[in-house]
């Protein structure tokens, strides 16, 4: 999942709402009211189908896939959109004449495994709407990031470093809210020709303060920035660790 995606099991929800579709609309409303952003939601009976459905009716639709219409829906999905299929796998599948779920469905589990290895059994289940992926209720974050696509491309260092200062403050808040600290800071720049550049620094010590994050981001910016218009700027922190755990480790020495 990317940073702006999430799964939610609403079978037994604390709100006591009896309709998953109703919950989806409530989430959309809440997100829009709190952060001013739209989101699309997929509702279904397993993770794979919910993920596939979320890509339809963007930017603010709700797509529901029921057991009754699942197979019909799956058969129309392009093979490159199946969960777990990357560029290399997609090319291999296409060379074998498998372009959509319709082409995938007739093949046996054994055939798929023989031709495509571990991906085969997963595709066999997915195309039948039987994906057995379990929802992970608690997962440690590997990174936290934020980025901004600019209304107008710019070479103005003041504007761009201003965003970095905002990002650093926002990331400090996220870290403290979750009792985390980081060691790696990554700057992302995308120019007017859609060339994306990233550069990272990993520190020896953990940090979680705005001024520390901003200082490193500024250093990266000065190393990366050339006189070309920037369309997007982003800042990500990783190598995260719980601050309570760090404190306990330090107390041992």
Residue ranges and their predicted role:
Residues 81, 91-232, 239-253:
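DNA-contacting surface of Y-family translesion DNA polymerases
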Residues 9-13, 190, 238:
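Solvent-exposed residues in well-ordered beta-strands and their adjoining turns
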Residues 5, 232-234:
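Extracellular/lumenal ectodomain signal focusing on beta-strand-rich modules
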Residues 1-151:
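Nucleic-acid-contacting surfaces of polymerase cores and analogous helical-repeat interfaces
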């Amino acid at each position: 999942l990317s940073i702006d995606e999430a799964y939610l099991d609403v079978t037994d929800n604390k709100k006591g709402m009896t309709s998953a579709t109703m919950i989806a609309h409530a989430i959309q409303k809440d997100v829009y009211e709190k952060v001013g952003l739209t989101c699309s939601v997929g509702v279904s009976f397993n993770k794979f189908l919910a993920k596939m459905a979320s890509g339809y009716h963007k930017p603010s639709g709700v797509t529901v896939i029921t057991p009754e219409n699942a197979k019909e829906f799956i058969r129309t999905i392009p093979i490159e959109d199946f969960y777990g299929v990357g560029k290399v796998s997609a090319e291999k599948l296409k060379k074998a004449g498998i372009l959509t779920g319709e082409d995938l469905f007739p093949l046996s589990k054994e055939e798929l495994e023989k031709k495509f290895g571990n991906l085969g059994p997963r595709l066999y289940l997915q195309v039948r709407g039987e994906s057995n992926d379990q929802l992970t209720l608690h997962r440690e974050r590997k990174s936290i990031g934020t980025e901004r696509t600019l209304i107008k491309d710019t070479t103005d260092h003041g504007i761009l470093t201003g965003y970095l200062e905002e990002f650093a403050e926002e990331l400090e808040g996220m870290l403290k809210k979750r009792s985390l600290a980081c060691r790696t800071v990554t700057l992302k720049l995308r120019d007017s020709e859609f060339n994306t550049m990233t550069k990272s620094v990993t520190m020896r010590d953990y940090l979680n303060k705005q001024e520390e994050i901003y200082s490193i981001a500024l250093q990266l910016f000065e190393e990366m920035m050339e006189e070309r218009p920037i369309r997007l700027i982003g800042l990500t922190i990783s190598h995260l660790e719980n601050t309570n755990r760090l404190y306990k480790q330090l107390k041992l020495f």
